[in-house]
């Protein structure tokens, strides 16, 4: 298959994906995800928006230094100062790209930019030319392209090409496009824009109408060769096109698309699990490809067919996306070498000290649980090793509840910014009592917007995974806690969310595409 059939995967999980409410990541977490994206085989990592804040600049710089194979892209507004800042952030990368953008729809030009079409074209030329002078790849995105006048969009693309852009991105910024018309728009641009033969056309689709993946695949079928996607489809509002769905859409229909990617599909599930653990947002059970129901069959007719031949109701294998679900024979008498091998198989690189921490946790869990599964080990790694340093830490918890007239109450002892504090509080139930006591200890009272419990594995001795979403003012964060005691898991999740809230970087204006 020729290079003309190669689709380049541009992952924007660390930039657009992070704009999903509650999905904020620290610099260290972004670096960990970037390394996993490199293992996954993505071609381009959009590391962030360096001009937004010093924290974003430092994160992009750290990612640029950490990965070797992917191109590292910095998002910049069509401003020389943004482009200079972006270049400084990625200059340590082995392969670099400046991604600059400007809106081209009448709505955006008039009401957001307050610019005339002529002024916008001049800004595109100036920004792309300035970026090209840095000696790096230059990508231009026409924000809100799907609602732009086609003739003006052609003019904007031509101005960008003449100024030095080699990648033209056509975003469906608000998820407005329909697959057939979006494909036609791509074909129109590729046949009408002067110089189109020398550039790569890309698409960046949002999911407001649930069509992000369909629009992306339609555009690729029409000739676009770069797909801008995120793991699990996380992103602004209803999210972005899902990386795993786009890739497996191409993989399962080779005779239709005749397109390939460089993605190692066996790393898809580990990558989505890794992201889920970092941002504290569980993968929905009904999520295509990644959800726990994706390879489950309840109907008797379906079960009969699958038992005869899995291809009757499965269009891909669980193994092809890295879902193994194997039982790990680890327990009280297992050694560190066995654990080390399993940790590496799961895709984690732990030093001796970190491995010891997980080993002790596995031993403790084995005292309470008969079988230790892959999911258990990964949950312990995320909980014990990869959790961000905490401003608030739980030291002691006691909860009383029952069917007596005494209201449920909780006693917590915590480290709060280096000081030990102890508080008692009652509540309408044990979880409410714990949350009230924790709030008193840390001195803040956020609103609890969401509370979810999931069993990581089956059985009455399964570890419970609790996810909470809290809001304090305009700031929203998600926390995650894992324990075989649901009350303890709930407490850990709430404290994790409070830590994320406390460490959230200064508010910044996030760009749209």
UniProtKB/Swiss-Prot annotation:
Principal location class: cytoplasm
Keywords from the named record: Amino-acid biosynthesis, Branched-chain amino acid biosynthesis, Cytoplasm, Leucine biosynthesis, Manganese, Metal-binding, Transferase
Subcellular location(s) per record: Cytoplasm
CC annotations in GO: cytoplasm
Cofactor(s) needed for function: Mn(2+)
One Pfam entry name: LeuA_dimer
Keyword Metal-binding: yes
Gene3D superfamilies: 1.10.238.260, 3.30.160.270, Aldolase class I
BP GO terms, sorted: L-leucine biosynthetic process
Binding site for Mn(2+): 16, 204, 206, 240
Subunit-level organization: Homodimer.
Its biological purpose: Catalyzes the condensation of the acetyl group of acetyl-CoA with 3-methyl-2-oxobutanoate (2-ketoisovalerate) to form 3-carboxy-3-hydroxy-4-methylpentanoate (2-isopropylmalate).
Protein name: 2-isopropylmalate synthase
